[in-house]
Amino acid sequence: MSEIRKNDHRLMQVLLAPVISEKATLVADKNEQVVFEVAPDATKQEVKAAVELLFKVEVDSVNVLVQKGKQKRFGRSMGRRKDVKKAYVCLKPGQEINFEAEAK
């Protein structure tokens, strides 16, 4: 963990954006989890350290997934959207991240 803490510059690049969707808000209300879009090469340990550093909360566990990009048509040719890596971050009981307050 100390090895990960030393590289704060890397931790600032791990979290790309919070995922605000219907499913993400249902998960947040029910299981005390928050969903983030993360860098494609980010590890679970880096995601945990980044959330703890940026939001000053305690993280219980992290689950990651890679959502494959869809085939889409761009004009005449077929293309493909990029893959997205998401992290479901489970917070310890009593911990909360409020994005409206963090933005101000």
UniProtKB/Swiss-Prot annotation:
It holds the Pfam family Ribosomal_L23. One of its GO terms (cellular component) is ribosome. It comes from the Bacteria. One of its GO terms (biological process) is translation. InterPro entries: Nucleotide-bd_a/b_plait_sf, Ribosomal_uL23-like, Ribosomal_uL23/eL15/eS24_sf. GO terms for molecular function: rRNA binding; structural constituent of ribosome. The keyword Signal does not apply. Keywords: Ribonucleoprotein, Ribosomal protein, RNA-binding, rRNA-binding. One of the early assembly proteins it binds 23S rRNA. One of the proteins that surrounds the polypeptide exit tunnel on the outside of the ribosome. Forms the main docking site for trigger factor binding to the ribosome. Belongs to the universal ribosomal protein uL23 family. Part of the 50S ribosomal subunit. Contacts protein L29, and trigger factor when it is bound to the ribosome. This is Large ribosomal subunit protein uL23. It comes from Burkholderia multivorans (strain ATCC 17616 / 249).
